[in-house]
């Protein structure tokens, strides 16, 4: 198992390995906006091209991997951000009572893209249908799109200093021509550059401890508790106010001396790392005070308690007058937190490794530095292999994901063991459907459309006679009833009872037991004799060794 890093600059794209020196360049790759690159599973890479209404598709898996463009998808207009929504995290499908593995050609459910004017496009990838277009999702350009909770909600941020949370079902519903957001966060005063969501997620926002971290050019980090968002309430005809449920609670605000460009969270939500023009800094969310005291900076006050988020000011450790011996308790009482400087560079993008030990830092010079978080040392620097220009521009996209080492392939995921879909020329004939330009009319029930979907290989261990609730619910209930009756008749005590039919069997069993006792006594006698003989041999050996040692001393 290894990790690969994918990063793009203004004029190039590169795929490299974190722990080895394997590296390739992507051809005809040009991006100028952040978050314009998205990985579709372990197979495809979508990159929205700069100054072109086009998405370049690169194949990254198996024997079909190519450095050149695999497919081009025309767009209605130039897109700035891309994101995909997976199929609710389903690992396999159950079809006709048989479990099927993930197929080789496995596409996500939705593809989302945004424009410079704040317009939001939603496509269904398996058919290419344009489900909906939100003309004014943001007043200005959208900077990032991210789905959470297996695609139930979608979060967007923009240059209009707003962060908006949408319900996916509202965006794709045919009956909802103008979808409304679930809630809007407008605490920032300048464009929101990046945001991250904590790893503690569940099926619903109300029963999770999901936290949202947003950063902006106003030099602030804001943390919200998303678990208090309720369902939307319909507006009544005679009421002027519209209630959309409880808004997220602002837990804390962190101010910095510099404008923030990027943020990344530790996989265990222990710390956050921010990138600025003056360097990369780390902040422990479980802040250690003097001695053994530890403070949770994001402690929530509860559902029924009105809490006003605290405001903290971040201070570099090397800028303190007292150095390492500075009184952390006094600084914390004044609302100041000491943060560590990881790297001094003009940071544009940040990512973290799967185990949280390595930090990947993309700068404005087109380089990606891999730094060890504990020692704050640069382990490796990755650059574009070949270029004829003096500068390739800043790093616009930075992605990391784990991959398998298979058949000596040290860079991209090896060819799967199942059947490969290929033609005589050795190219993959499974193509992604073209993205439509006209919104699909879902109200027309007689209008049919095609969906491109491949079914994976069936699992060998699956019992074909197994009844599933989606296929035959009555048979499934009968099967559960049978299993329950079997368990109800089984007692808690398991014992073996020997039944003696007559006296002859009893006498023979007694004779066999007596013979076994005699054999055991004889074996014990033999063991005692062998032990006594071994002791005599050991004494003789010790005496001979002493005599031999005395003879050597005389010589």
Swiss-Prot record:
WD repeat positions: 90-133, 137-176, 187-234, 342-383
Cell location: Nucleus
Superkingdom: Eukaryota
A single BP term in Gene Ontology: rRNA processing
SUPFAM superfamilies: WD40 repeat-like
Gene3D superfamilies: YVTN repeat-like/Quinoprotein amine dehydrogenase
Family membership noted in the UniProt record: Belongs to the WD repeat IPI3/WDR18 family.
InterPro entries hit by this protein: WD40/YVTN_repeat-like_dom_sf, WD40_repeat_dom_sf, WD40_rpt, WDR18/Ipi3/RID3
Protein keywords: Nucleus, Phosphoprotein, Repeat, Ribosome biogenesis, rRNA processing, WD repeat
Function: Component of the RIX1 complex required for processing of ITS2 sequences from 35S pre-rRNA.
Residues modified to Phosphoserine: 388
Pfam families: WD40
Cellular component terms per the entry's GO annotation: nuclear pre-replicative complex; rixosome complex
Subunit and interaction comment: Component of the RIX1 complex, composed of IPI1, RIX1/IPI2 and IPI3 in a 1:2:2 stoichiometry. The complex interacts (via RIX1) with MDN1 (via its hexameric AAA ATPase ring) and the pre-60S ribosome particles.
Location (main, coarse): nucleus
The protein, known as: Pre-rRNA-processing protein IPI3
Organism: Saccharomyces cerevisiae (strain YJM789)
SMART domains linked: WD40
């Amino acid at each position: 198992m290894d990790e690969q890093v994918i990063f793009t600059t203004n004029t190039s794209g590169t795929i490299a390995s974190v722990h080895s020196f394997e590296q390739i360049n992507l051809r005809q790759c040009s991006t100028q906006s952040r978050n314009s690159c998205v990985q579709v599973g372990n197979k495809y890479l979508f990159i929205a091209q700069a100054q072109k209404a086009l998405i370049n598709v690169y194949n990254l898996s198996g024997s079909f991997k190519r450095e050149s463009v695999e497919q081009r998808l025309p767009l209605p207009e130039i897109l700035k951000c891309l994101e995909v929504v997976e199929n609710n995290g389903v690992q396999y499908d159950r079809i006709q009572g048989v479990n099927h593995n993930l197929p080789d050609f496995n596409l996500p459910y939705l593809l989302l893209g945004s424009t410079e004017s704040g317009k939001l496009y939603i496509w269904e990838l398996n058919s290419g249908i344009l489900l909906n277009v939100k003309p004014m999702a943001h007043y200005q350009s959208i900077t990032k799109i991210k789905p959470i909770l297996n695609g139930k909600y979608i979060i967007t941020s923009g240059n209009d200093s707003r962060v908006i949370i949408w319900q996916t079902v509202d965006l794709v519903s045919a009956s909802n021509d103008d979808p409304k957001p679930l809630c809007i966060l407008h605490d920032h005063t300048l464009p929101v550059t990046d945001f991250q969501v904590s790893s503690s997620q569940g099926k619903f926002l109300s029963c999770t401890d999901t936290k949202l971290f947003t950063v902006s050019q106003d030099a602030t980090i804001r943390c919200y508790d998303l678990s208090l968002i309720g369902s939307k309430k319909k507006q009544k005809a005679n009421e002027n106010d519209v209630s959309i449920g409880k808004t997220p609670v602002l837990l804390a605000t962190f101010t910095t001396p510099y404008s923030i460009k990027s943020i990344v969270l530790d996989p265990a939500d222990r710390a956050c790392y921010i990138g600025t023009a003056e360097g990369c800094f780390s902040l422990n969310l479980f802040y250690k005070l003097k001695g053994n005291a530890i403070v949770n900076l994001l402690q929530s006050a509860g559902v029924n308690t009105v809490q006003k988020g605290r405001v903290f000011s971040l201070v570099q450790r090397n800028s303190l007058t007292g150095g390492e011996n500075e009184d952390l308790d006094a600084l914390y009482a004044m609302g100041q937190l000491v943060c560590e400087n990881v790297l001094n560079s003009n940071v544009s993008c940040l990512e973290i490794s799967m185990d949280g030990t390595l930090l990947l830092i993309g700068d404005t010079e087109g380089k990606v530095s891999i730094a060890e978080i504990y020692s704050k040392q640069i382990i490796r620097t990755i650059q574009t292999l070949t270029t004829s220009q003096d500068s390739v521009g800043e790093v616009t996209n930075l992605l990391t994901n784990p991959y398998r080492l298979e058949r000596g392939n040290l860079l991209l995921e090896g060819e799967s063991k199942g059947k490969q879909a290929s033609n005589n020329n050795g190219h993959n004939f499974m193509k992604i459907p073209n993205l439509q330009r006209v919104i699909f009319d879902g109200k027309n029930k007689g209008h049919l459309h095609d969906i491109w979907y491949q079914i994976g290989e069936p699992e060998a261990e699956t019992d074909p006679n197994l009844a599933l609730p989606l296929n035959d619910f009555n048979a499934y209930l009968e099967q559960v009833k049978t299993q329950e009756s079997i368990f109800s008749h089984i007692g808690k005590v398991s014992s073996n009872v020997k039944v003696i039919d007559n006296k002859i069997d009893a006498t023979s069993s007694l004779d066999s037991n007596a013979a076994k006792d005699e054999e055991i006594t004889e074996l014990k006698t033999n063991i005692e004799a062998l032990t006594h003989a071994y002791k005599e041999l050991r004494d003789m050996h010790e005496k001979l060794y002493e005599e031999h040692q005395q003879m050597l001393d005389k010589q």
